[in-house]
């Protein structure tokens, strides 16, 4: 378990922003401690009204969702002093530029409509416009064209919700997908040794330039690693991330 947070303080005006290489919360530098929540199989039993208080008590201050949440879920997060990192899930796993261009247009429309409704919600912290486009598809569609499409989504979001941090959740196989308009660099990485993480973090900061780095997924293969192994790596990962900036 992470060291406990102070007692929750409900702040209706709470807002996550980007200042240079760092995130700020309500104007002060803030180190996000995020846990992924979902996606869940159709028959899974999960209850956010019970899970979110547990997430907060475990020492996390934010949850990454793999969808654009409705008002009820955003309200529940805010009530538990959790920041929501929303992910726009659309058909980016196929050729959305030549074979199915309507997917991208639908994605733009869905994102702008959702942001119009929820951009000022105190529980919303940031938006990811996609997650891990398969490397073979990215190469097939041409990397710079994929980057341009992702950048279009980000600029749409920034136009509708100025100041709301937006990015794309990348992974090491497609380092070249780094939309220029992104407010921060987001990466999903699974490195099972602290030394490997320590060696890769400087690479991420190099890719990010003057933007913050946010590890949007991190952990171990739970089928092969015990809870003890996970509990050992997590504090080390937090320490290394802080040291890397």
Show which residues each predicted segment covers.
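Hydrophobic alpha-helical segments, principally membrane-spanning helices and signal/leader peptides
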Residues: 11-12, 202
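Extracellular glycoside hydrolase catalytic/binding regions
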Residues: 139, 145-244
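Active-site mouth of glycoside hydrolases
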Residues: 10, 17-18, 24-185
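Short, positively charged and aromatic/hydrophobic N-terminal segments
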Residues: 1-3, 10
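A short, acidic/glycine-rich surface segment
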Residues: 19-22, 195-197
């Amino acid at each position: 378990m992470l060291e406990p947070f102070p007692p929750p303080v409900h702040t209706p005006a709470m807002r996550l922003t980007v200042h240079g290489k760092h995130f700020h919360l309500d104007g002060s530098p803030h180190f996000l401690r995020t846990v992924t929540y979902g996606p869940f199989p159709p028959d899974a039993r999960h209850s956010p009204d019970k899970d979110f208080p547990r997430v907060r008590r475990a020492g996390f201050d934010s949850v990454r969702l793999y969808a654009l949440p409705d008002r009820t879920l955003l309200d529940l997060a805010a009530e538990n002093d959790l920041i929501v990192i929303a992910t726009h899930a659309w058909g980016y796993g196929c050729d959305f530029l030549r074979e199915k261009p309507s997917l991208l247009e639908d994605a733009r429309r869905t994102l702008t409509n959702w942001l119009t409704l929820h951009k000022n919600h105190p529980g919303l912290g940031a938006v990811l416009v996609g997650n891990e486009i398969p490397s073979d598809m990215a190469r097939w569609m041409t990397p710079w064209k994929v980057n341009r499409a992702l950048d279009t989504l980000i600029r749409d979001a920034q136009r509708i919700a100025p100041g709301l941090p937006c990015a794309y959740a990348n992974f090491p196989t497609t380092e070249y997908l780094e939309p220029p308009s992104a407010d921060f660099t987001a990466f999903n990485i699974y490195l099972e040794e602290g030394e490997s993480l320590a060696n890769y973090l400087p690479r991420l900061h190099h890719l990010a330039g003057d933007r913050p780095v946010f590890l949007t997924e991190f952990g171990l293969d739970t089928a092969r690693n015990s809870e003890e192994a996970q509990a050992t790596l997590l504090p080390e990962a937090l320490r290394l991330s802080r040291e890397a900036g």
